[in-house]
Amino acid sequence: MKNIFMAVIEFYQRFISPVLPNSCRYYPSCSEYSLHEFKFNSFFGAFFATVLRILRCNPLFRGGIDYPLVRLKIQHQKAIFKICRSEVKFWFVPCKSGKFYVIKSFKKEK
């Protein structure tokens, strides 16, 4: 079910959003916010957070920066150093115990 919603959002971002003017009052945009929610949270939690975000995205609210908040259990491991060439796609910034803000990492331009 999550994959269906994510596919619809990606379709919207790729084909519909470029035709419309920029109107989202928040950063990241509502569609990007909902993609992160569906990627890292349960279906119902992500759906509820997305609906609330879309309802807040209007002239009656200030807008601003509103990163998605996700629950993660991070395993603490001993430091193992090895060379790897993987790129960082998301940063998880601690907020409360077990909750993190999801911040997307952008590609570095040369």
Curated annotation (Swiss-Prot):
Q: Where in the cell is it found?
A: Cell inner membrane
- Provide GO CC annotations from the record: plasma membrane
Pfam families reported in the protein's UniProt record = YidD
**Predominant location category:** membrane
Keywords carried by this UniProt record: Cell inner membrane, Cell membrane, Membrane
Q: Which InterPro entries match?
A: Membr_insert_effic_factor_YidD
Q: How does it sit in the membrane?
A: Peripheral membrane protein
Q: Which SMART domains match?
A: Haemolytic (SM01234)
Role description: Could be involved in insertion of integral membrane proteins into the membrane.
Which family does the entry's similarity section mention? Belongs to the UPF0161 family.
Q: Which HAMAP family does its entry note?
A: UPF0161_YidD (MF_00386)
Its recorded name reads: Putative membrane protein insertion efficiency factor
What species was this sequence derived from? Campylobacter hominis (strain ATCC BAA-381 / DSM 21671 / CCUG 45161 / LMG 19568 / NCTC 13146 / CH001A)
